[in-house]
Amino acid sequence: MTHIVWRTRDDNPWLSMAKEVVLKFLPPPGEDALTCGPGPFSMADEPMVRKMMEIAGYRDITFRRVDAPVLVGKTVEDAIGFQLAIGPAGEVFREAGSQAEAKRAEIETAMAAAINAQKKDADGIIMNSSSWIISGKNPS
């Protein structure tokens, strides 16, 4: 089996930065929030994932780090729309409902400032990402 997962929040500012901006204006989702699951970083911890795979019967487990740029939008407006639609920032924004809509202009202004500080090239706004490619064999 081979799968790819995100590494830590710190290794993936393209997802974590936007959430940090949104949390300056909105509360984090509560325990009963309708979230999208354990989150994109739930398998970032190599020792924990290795142990889970071993318990499931996998052997010859390898982790290979892959760092790569990711396009978050062709324009700042595209990037803001992307960040508020998916991922950790989008989840906080959706869960806040009318409170988020009331603060949308402030949030978008703050997010635009953060996004404008990122690298830009001919394709758009580029940010760093980091993943694990995890492989293992299950002899059974």
Please state what every model-predicted region is:
Residues 1-6, 41, 110, 114, ...:
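Amphipathic alpha-helical hairpins
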Residues 2-74:
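Conserved catalytic/acceptor-binding region of the Class I
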Residues 15-22, 49, 53, 79-83, ...:
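Hydrophobic alpha-helical core bundles mediating ligand binding, dimerization, or RNAP-core interactions
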Residues 28-35, 98-102, 138-140:
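Intrinsically disordered, low-complexity coil segments
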Residues 38-42, 102, 131-135:
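Amphipathic alpha-helical surface "interface" segments used
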Residues 56-59, 76-89, 127-140:
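Core SAM-dependent methyltransferase catalytic element
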Residues 62-121:
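C-terminal helical/coil "lid" or tail adjacent to the Rossmann-like core of SAM-dependent
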